């Protein structure tokens, strides 16, 4: 008899495919799409899904646009998400994947790529977008916004409380990389308070002294487990 603990927790997309065994995955929100790094992975794993990709940085969005043109069923948007709608400063780095609505923290780890630039960018709330787009079910919500994950979740209160989001994949920072960043404790309390189960950490990155810098976390709504039998251990 195979041990499931030996196969879960290794590949976050493979695990998502195993958790979401009910309705076919048809809607993926890629928040913090940057230059489109996740597009091909999502498309290969979930071929029937429409991917909605969001990127507020003008320069990164132009690269995202080119990447999306090569992938079917992708819709792109030149704005990001926060706890309120409006124009806000986006802190810009030489490496666009480090851009954040937050300023750099005391343990910001890229001295050669400081967040020393700013650009005005548009932000919306996730609740507004879902209402505007008429989306009633989100299979995968991916959030990678460099420390601002809690701002996105605060703007998604209605979506989280109404159980229209089946799973959430998001990045969590453990060092003080960004000023006012969401913590594991805050994110855990927020999502478990809305009925989500924490299922694992993936793609962990450590600094030279062994401290965990950041990783991806996966939360699945408890409703996805409603018809599954309780585990039986020897």
Question: For the regions a protein language model found, what residue spans apply to each?
Answer:
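Phosphate/nucleotide-binding beta-alpha loop and adjacent structural elements of enzyme active sites
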Residues: 1-234
């Amino acid at each position: 008899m195979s041990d499931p603990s030996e196969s879960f927790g290794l590949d976050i997309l493979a695990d998502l495919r195993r958790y979401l065994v009910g309705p076919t995955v048809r809607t993926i929100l890629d928040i913090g799409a940057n230059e489109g790094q996740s597009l091909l992975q999502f498309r290969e794993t979930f071929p029937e899904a429409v991917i909605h990709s969001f990127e507020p940085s003008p320069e990164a969005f132009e690269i995202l646009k080119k990447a999306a043109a090569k992938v079917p069923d992708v819709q792109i948007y030149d704005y990001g998400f926060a706890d309120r709608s409006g124009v806000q400063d986006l802190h810009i780095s030489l490496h666009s994947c480090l851009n954040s609505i937050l300023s750099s923290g005391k343990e910001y780890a890229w001295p050669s790529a400081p967040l020393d630039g700013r650009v005005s960018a548009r932000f919306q709330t996730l609740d507004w977008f879902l209402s505007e787009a008429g989306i009633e079910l989100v299979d995968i919500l991916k959030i990678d916004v460099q420390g601002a994950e809690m701002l996105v979740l605060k703007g998604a209160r209605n979506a989280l409380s109404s159980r229209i989001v089946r799973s959430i994949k998001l990045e969590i920072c453990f060092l003080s990389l960004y000023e006012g960043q969401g913590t594991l404790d805050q994110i855990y309390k927020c999502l478990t308070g809305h009925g989500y189960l924490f299922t694992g950490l993936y793609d962990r990155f450590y600094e030279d002294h062994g401290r965990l810098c950041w990783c991806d976390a996966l939360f699945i709504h408890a409703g996805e487990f409603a018809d599954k039998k309780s585990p039986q251990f020897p």
